[in-house]
Amino acid sequence: MTLIVEAKQRLDAFSLDAAFTSERGVTALFGRSGSGKTSMIRIIAGLARPDEGRVVLDGEPLTETTTGIFVPKHRRRFGYVFQEARLFPHLSIRANLTYGRWFAARTAHGESFDHIVDLLGIETLLERSPAKLSGGEKQRVAIGRALLSSPRLLLMDEPLAALDDARKAEILPYLERLRDETDIPIVYVSHSIAEVARLANQVVVMRDGKVEATGPAIDILSRPSTASDRREAGALLEGTVESFDARHHLSTVALKSCQVHIPGAALAPGKSVRIRIPSRDVMLATTRPEGLSALNILEARIDGMSSTEDGTVEIRLDCGGDIILSRITTLSCERLDLRQGRAIFAIIKTVALEA
C-alpha cells in the first residue's frame, strides 16, 4: 500500500502546505494541537477538499485538483475512528458492529465478525447497550465497526484523547494487535509521543501546517526537535526480551550491544519490544559509579553535543550502536569536561516500556 498526500489549503488565519508518502503499517501524524494533523486526515478521508493537491492510494487518484477528480467519502472505502465513539445509543453492541457491514463493498473480503470481536476483546459486550460501556470499551467497538466495513485504509483521529490514563492503558494493547495481526494500513493522528512511540512504524511530524520531518519512528522520535515539550525528549530503542526475574519482577531486554532491566513488566522471552529513555532521566559520570540504586548503567561515547537557549546541553550518546540522549546543565558539562568522543557512563533512572 502506498498513500501519497499533497495538500495546500487556506483556512482563515491558518495555512496548510504539507505532503507525505505513507507505506504499509501505522503512519502517525504527530504534532501539537493546531499543527494541521486533523486538516490533513479530513482531506485524506474526503471530508474536505484542498485548494491544491492530491490524494492517491495505490496509484488511484481520489483527490486531484489539477484534473478535478474528487471521489466522495462514501466511495473511498476508508474506516474512520473519531475522538468520540459515536455509537448508536438505541442499538446493541452487536447491531452497532454489524452496521459497519452495510458499508463494505460487495466484492470486499474483510476480516470476519468473530475475528474482529476476538481481536478487540469485546465478546462479552455484544448484547449490552452503549450506555453500559466504559469509554475504552466504546472506542474498541467503534474500531470494530470501522474494521467490519472492510476498509482499504483506517483513519484514526486522536482516538484516545478523550480517555483517562487507565482507559488508554486498557485499549493500547488492542491497537497493537490491530497493527500486528491485520493487513489494514492505518493513519493515526495524535499529539501524544507515548502513543506514537508505542504504535507507529512511520512518523510525520507537523508544525504550523507544514511537515517538519518524516521517517521511521525509531529515528524521528529520537530527535530532540521532535518533542513538543522538552520533558518529552528522549530515545526510542528496539530490543528483545531475554529473561524475566519473577522474584524481583524485572525483565531483561537485550539491545544491540547492551542490556537494560525494566521493572514490573512480565514479558515473554523472545518478544520484540520498544523502550523509551527520556533524556531528562539520563545522568552522566566520567567513572563507573558505585553505591547507586540505578539498575541501568551503560558504557557510552559522546557522539554529539548541542547547546540550548535555556542553559542546558543536549548530549547524544553512542552505547555500542544504540543512541540515547541526555540533557544536562551547561555548568555540569563544563565541570565534567565533556567533549566529542569522550568515554562516559550513562546512568538511566527510568526506562519506559512502549511495546
From Swiss-Prot:
ATP binds at residues 31-38. It is an enzyme of class 7 (translocase). GO terms for cellular component: plasma membrane. Keywords: ATP-binding, Cell inner membrane, Cell membrane, Membrane, Molybdenum, Nucleotide-binding, Translocase, Transport. It catalyses: molybdate(out) + ATP + H2O = molybdate(in) + ADP + phosphate + H(+). Its main location: membrane. Its EC number is 7.3.2.5. It comes from the Bacteria. Residues 291-355 form the Mop domain. PROSITE patterns: ABC_TRANSPORTER_1, ABC_TRANSPORTER_2, MODC, MOP. PANTHER family: ABC TRANSPORTER I FAMILY MEMBER 10. Belongs to the ABC transporter superfamily. Molybdate importer (TC 3.A.1.8) family. The complex is composed of two ATP-binding proteins (ModC), two transmembrane proteins (ModB) and a solute-binding protein (ModA). Part of the ABC transporter complex ModABC involved in molybdenum import. Responsible for energy coupling to the transport system. This is Molybdenum import ATP-binding protein ModC. The lineage of its organism: Bacteria, Pseudomonadati, Pseudomonadota, Alphaproteobacteria, Hyphomicrobiales. The gene is modC.
